[in-house]
């Protein structure tokens, strides 16, 4: 039955992301003229099981994705109630009919799915996070700030992709976030002093990429910056090795810090680091099929949360394996990895039922849209990972969280977080 919530138009638009690469924005409009949009982000380091993007000319355009939105998705969703997220996403999945979303494109599908959700919340006069959360009052997640970059995110010799700080022991998000900024500023000064001002330029996610070669060099810089800022015992450390990127499958070895390590040696390497530094977060420490090694490491690191990103790719099929093997205490949530909001909800609900912590994450290729911040609050994610406190496409998410806390008085999750 056609009503004011019925979808009247779906329209695609080619835009650019924060790396200057093309991506797709999809608009969804109701019969009442209410309209919103969804943007498709893109990762630099991708799991092999992620939804496939539709791109043309060696990735230089997304014209085909725009055509798919305009000529296939538009008529398919015409007249559907925009509040029916499950029905909308099922139609998209059925039309695509592939396991990896390669027909319509994961980018086209997720942009449409996000646009539908945002339009529905707007039509109902609700904030996006409130529309997702329902009657419960969620908490603001703990931010994971990626302040030193390595791996595929940088041009230095560091193999670890992200070195992270976590401001945990604070009463409010604002307090926590601005304390983290103090550490970021201290780090900038330290890098400038030791390596030269040229190395304080920021990378794709707003972090620094000083000319470092070994993991401990980066950890020492961050540890010193935390202490200099006076936040020892309140701001902790984490890493995202993205280990698939420095794994040699032929040798079955990990190439890191000038050494070739087998999985057991790499595990010992992480255990040593956890003894030396206040590391409470470790994401993708092994290559993406190593469910057992993830579990062994998690079992030995009681005070550190081992997280699966490429291990799961926000896919319930792989999460079930991880649950059975007790691989991790946490999962990364990236809606564009699986392709629809409904499938993302299935994933987060299963994780929650099994007491697994949620880490809602941006991608390295982002836009200025702050949807992922609202999404993180709405699902009451334990953490949010959206880069350093620099670059507009990163700060837009943090500013949205500050606004939500100020306007709605939500409590900060870090206040209740115990290691």
UniProtKB/Swiss-Prot annotation:
Its cofactor is Mg(2+). Belongs to the enolase family. It is found in: Cytoplasm; Secreted; Cell surface. Binds a second Mg(2+) ion via substrate during catalysis. GO terms for cellular component: cell surface; extracellular region; phosphopyruvate hydratase complex. Pathway: Carbohydrate degradation; glycolysis; pyruvate from D-glyceraldehyde 3-phosphate: step 4/5. GO terms for molecular function: magnesium ion binding; phosphopyruvate hydratase activity. It comes from Saccharolobus islandicus (strain Y.N.15.51 / Yellowstone #2) (Sulfolobus islandicus). One of its GO terms (biological process) is glycolytic process. The active site is at residues 205, 334. PROSITE patterns: ENOLASE. The lineage of its organism: Archaea, Thermoproteota, Thermoprotei, Sulfolobales, Sulfolobaceae. InterPro entries: Enolase, Enolase-like_C_sf, Enolase-like_N, Enolase_C, Enolase_CS, Enolase_N. Mg(2+) binds at residues 240, 283, 309. (2R)-2-phosphoglycerate binds at residues 161, 334, 363-364, 385. Keywords: Cytoplasm, Glycolysis, Lyase, Magnesium, Metal-binding, Secreted. This is Enolase. It catalyses: (2R)-2-phosphoglycerate = phosphoenolpyruvate + H2O. Catalyzes the reversible conversion of 2-phosphoglycerate (2-PG) into phosphoenolpyruvate (PEP). It is essential for the degradation of carbohydrates via glycolysis.
């Amino acid at each position: 039955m056609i009503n004011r919530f019925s979808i009247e138009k779906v329209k695609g638009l080619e835009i650019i992301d924060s790396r200057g690469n093309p991506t797709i924005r999809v608009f969804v409009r109701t019969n009442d003229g209410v309209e919103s949009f969804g943007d498709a982000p893109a990762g630099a380091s991708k799991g092999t099981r992620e939804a496939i993007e539709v791109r043309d000319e060696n990735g230089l355009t997304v014209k085909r994705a725009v055509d798919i939105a305009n000529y296939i998705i538009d008529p398919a969703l015409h007249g559907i109630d925009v509040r029916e997220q499950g029905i909308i996403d099922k139609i998209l999945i059925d039309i695509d009919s592939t396991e990896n979303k390669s027909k319509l494109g994961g980018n086209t599908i997720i942009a449409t799915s996000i646009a539908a959700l945002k339009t529905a919340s707007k039509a109902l006069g609700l904030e996006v996070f409130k529309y997702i959360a329902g009657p419960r009052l969620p908490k603001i997640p703990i931010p994971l700030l990626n302040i030193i970059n390595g791996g595929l995110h940088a041009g230095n010799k560091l193999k670890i992709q992200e070195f992270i700080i976590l401001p945990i022991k604070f009463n409010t998000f604002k307090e926590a976030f601005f304390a983290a900024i103090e550490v970021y500023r201290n780090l900038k000064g330290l890098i400038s002093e030791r390596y030269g001002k040229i190395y304080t330029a920021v990378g794709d996610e707003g972090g620094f990429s000083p000319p470092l070669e070994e993991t401990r060099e980066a950890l020492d810089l961050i540890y010193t910056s935390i202490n200099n800022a006076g936040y020892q015992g309140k701001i902790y450390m984490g890493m995202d090795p993205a280990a698939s990127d420095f794994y040699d499958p032929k040798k079955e070895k990990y190439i890191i810090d000038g050494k070739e390590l087998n999985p057991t040696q790499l595990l010992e390497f992480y255990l040593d680091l956890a003894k030396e530094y206040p590391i409470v977060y470790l994401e993708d420490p092994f290559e993406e099929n190593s469910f057992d090694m993830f579990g062994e490491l998690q079992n030995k690191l009681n005070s550190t949360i081992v997280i699966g990103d490429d291990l799961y790719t926000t896919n319930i099929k792989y999460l079930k394996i991880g649950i059975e093997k007790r691989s991790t205490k946490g999962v990364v949530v990236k809606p564009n990895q699986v392709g629809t909001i409904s499938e993302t909800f299935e994933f987060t609900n299963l994780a929650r039922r099994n007491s697994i912590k949620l880490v809602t994450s941006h991608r390295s290729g982002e836009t200025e849209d702050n949807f992922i911040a609202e999404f993180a609050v709405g699902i009451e994610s334990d953490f949010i990972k959206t880069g350093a406190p620099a670059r507009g496409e990163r700060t837009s998410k943090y500013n949205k969280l500050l606004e939500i806390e100020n306007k709605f008085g939500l409590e900060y999750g870090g206040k209740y977080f115990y290691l």
